[in-house]
Regions:
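Long, Ser/Thr/Pro/Gly-rich and/or acidic low-complexity regions in intracellular
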Residues: 1-132, 147-150, 156, 160, ...
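Intrinsically disordered, low-complexity, charge-biased terminal/linker regions in eukaryotic proteins
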Residues: 137-140, 154-157
Length: 652
């Protein structure tokens, strides 16, 4: 009866209490002092209902692990208790909190960590079993549990209970959005650890055999999308490196081609190098389907596994464009074979590499007029005055061909290009990437507007471009020549100015470029990449790790312990960065490092040639022909001369 009296007079402290007589219940029934005695007795006899137990952040912060161990855990894991717990209710709270109002995430994480660290497995099992009895919107609280390998099998069921109701996606998002970056990283660790352990155990070689994977991936995708909007962790932290390229992918592709949910629907968790290999496997499957169709329709004799182009070296661009522009997308994804008209030779990779190199150099010549070059950023951008749109379409096709032929291109675009290719909207701040100098000037205007009136500068809504020493003016908005920039319309001016240079002034050129690129690249596995990832696939990395190159190197008539091989790697690792690039050009015809680093570059060294001769190379096979020099000094002298004078030494 004391408990009932306390509830009536003081309340239990829970604004979400449902007990009709509890003062904390915003909808409680008032009882006068005269009625109190009889009411308490009758309630105690007939319908006594104890107010739900709940735990406040303040209580948690003062707890010790032993206090948690002694708690009647089950009493705190029912639906009503969870609704009230972990909230910092304001004094005299007079209404029921909505959603996750007043929730204190730090207290949830602390409590769950205490619980998992001091409880025995049976108690933890009860905790997991209790989740199914809780209303869906309260289950998200259990995203704050720590990951412990010994409870691995329970987490899959937890993720299922949290995500199986489609309506709950919004609840999950709402709950996570209120978390600090530190707490989001803890939830990320929970889901990532579960997925990593699952793939390590090999229990998901086939996606359709392990449905819990999908529930974890749904949750991980919510975190991934939140991270895109407001980064709380490096995007590479979403990679699950235990996904093995040697896994059985047939079921994954079967689901993928049928637009059904599977691992490839969440390709952001696949490390980039492995994902590129998966893209090639996807293409192989598509080519196989095309071949099967050709056989069934008696067109087999017309089917070629290669994209064969006959190119006139003296008319490189036109012959390349004519050879490519009308090809079917499925044909553009085939392995490229180049035949230069009038020249002897079979393309085993080297001729194609040369074609890519020649066409990129031609198209990116500043005097050719397709692109402008920023000397400070050392990057190219579309020339708004260029009017041969077919050439832009050609370079777009070339970028796509490079992806499917494992060619790293020596091009340098600002990263906004890859955003635009992936249909990611640009912002004013993206202009900083295109032209940092002008961007900083615009930011000075913004700072000026805080203390002064920018209208004093007499700026108008115009942009000026120089065309053959002639300045041409363009209105940023209708009638812009007559509209003065003021503090009130400054942000509009900044946005339109950035949009003009990033988008509207080069819209025709970019659209043609994108059309060519998309003619080759249509796979969701590529188009769902981040801009940084797509840039790496096309342009490679800048990490020249020669230790990784050595670990993956193959030898013929040498061994890793041969004196000449030891000499070579000692020399190679001591080279300057520019010399290392020249060595790569000499052997592979490219100084760019492929996705995954030099450890994923095929690199052969064979014993070939007279010790009096210089080293040579076969760029078709990334092979260095290294004579058996008798000491390191001679080898270094010969090798440096060869790479510094590479033209004429390579045997394509």
């Amino acid at each position: 009866m004391d408990n009932i009296t306390h509830s009536i007079k003081e309340g239990c402290g829970n604004p979400m209490c449902n007990n009709a007589y509890c003062k904390s219940n915003p909808e409680h029934s008032s009882i006068s002092e005269n009625e109190m005695g009889d009411f308490v007795v009758l309630t105690a006899i007939n319908e006594y209902k104890e107010c739900c137990k709940f735990i406040t952040p303040k209580q948690i912060y003062s707890m010790t692990p032993n206090d948690v161990f002694q708690l009647p855990i089950e009493a705190y894991l029912n639906d009503n208790s969870l609704k009230a717990s972990f909230r910092d209710f304001p004094d005299n709270c007079s209404s029921r909190p909505k959603g996750f109002e007043y929730i204190n995430h730090q207290s949830i994480f602390l409590f769950m960590n205490f619980l998992f660290n001091v409880s025995n497995p049976e108690t933890i099992k009860k905790v997991f079993n209790s989740i199914s009895l809780v209303q869906p919107e309260q289950r998200v609280l259990f995203l704050c549990v720590p990951y412990q390998t010994k409870y691995h099998n329970y987490y899959g069921a937890l993720f299922k209970l949290i995500t199986e109701n489609p309506i709950n996606k919004e609840v999950i998002h709402q709950f996570l959005c209120q978390m600090s970056p530190e707490h989001l990283r803890q939830v990320h660790f929970l889901v990532h650890s579960f997925l990593d352990e699952m793939f390590k155990q090999g229990s998901v070689q086939r996606s359709n055999k392990y449905p819990f994977m999908i529930y974890a991936l749904r949750l991980f995708k919510i975190l991934y999308e939140m991270n895109i909007a407001n980064e709380f962790i490096d995007y590479k932290s979403f990679y699950v490196y235990s996904i093995n390229i040697k896994r059985e992918w047939s079921d994954d592709f079967d689901l993928f081609f049928k637009n059904k949910e599977g691992l490839l629907s969440y390709s952001f968790i696949i490390e980039l190098y492995t994902r590129v290999l998966v893209v090639h496997e996807e293409n192989r499957c598509e080519q196989q389907l095309t071949l099967s169709g050709a056989i069934q329709n008696n067109f087999f004799e017309l089917f070629s596994p290669y994209l064969e182009l006959r190119i006139d070296r003296d008319n490189l661009l036109l012959s390349s464009l004519n050879s490519l522009v009308n090809k079917r997308p499925i044909d553009l994804k085939k392995e490229l074979k180049i035949k230069f008209i009038g020249e002897v030779g079979v393309d085993q990779g080297g001729v194609s590499k040369e074609w890519f190199s020649l066409i990129v150099k031609e198209l990116f010549k500043v005097d050719f007029g397709m692109f402008t070059y920023n000397n400070k950023t050392r990057q190219f951008w579309f020339c708004s005055f260029a009017d041969d749109l077919q050439d832009f379409k050609l370079i777009g096709i070339v970028l796509g061909l490079a992806i499917y032929n494992n060619i790293i291109l020596d091009i340098s675009f600002p990263s906004i290009l890859y955003k635009k290719l992936l249909d990611i909207p640009l912002t004013f701040d993206d202009y900083n990437i295109l032209d940092p100098e002008v961007y900083n000037s615009l930011m000075q205007l913004k700072e000026m507007s805080k203390v002064d009136d920018v209208s004093s500068l007499q700026l108008t809504f115009e942009a000026v471009q120089n065309y053959f020493d002639e300045n041409r003016s363009y209105e940023l908005i209708p009638g812009g020549r007559d509209i003065i920039v003021t503090n009130q319309n400054l942000q509009l001016y900044l946005d339109r100015y950035a949009d003009f240079y990033c988008t509207s002034s080069v819209q025709k050129q970019f659209d043609a470029f994108k059309q060519g690129f998309r003619q080759v690249v249509s796979s969701p596995l590529l188009l769902s990449m981040r801009p940084e990832e797509l840039e790496l696939v096309i342009c490679g990395t800048k990490e020249y790790d020669f230790d990784a190159l050595e670990r993956n190197a193959k030898y013929k008539d040498y061994t890793p312990n041969s004196p000449q091989i030891k000499y070579f790697w000692e020399i190679a690792k001591s080279l300057t960065l520019e010399q290392k690039k020249k060595l790569l050009i000499f052997v592979t015809s490219n100084d760019r490092v492929p996705v995954g680093g030099l450890g994923n570059l095929i690199f052969f060294i064979d014993r070939y040639g007279d010790p009096e001769k210089f080293p040579t190379a076969s760029t078709c096979f990334n092979a260095l022909h290294l004579p058996p020099y008798e000491n390191k000094e001679i080898m270094k002298e010969k090798l440096l001369f060869a790479i510094e004078n590479a033209v004429g030494f390579g045997l394509a």
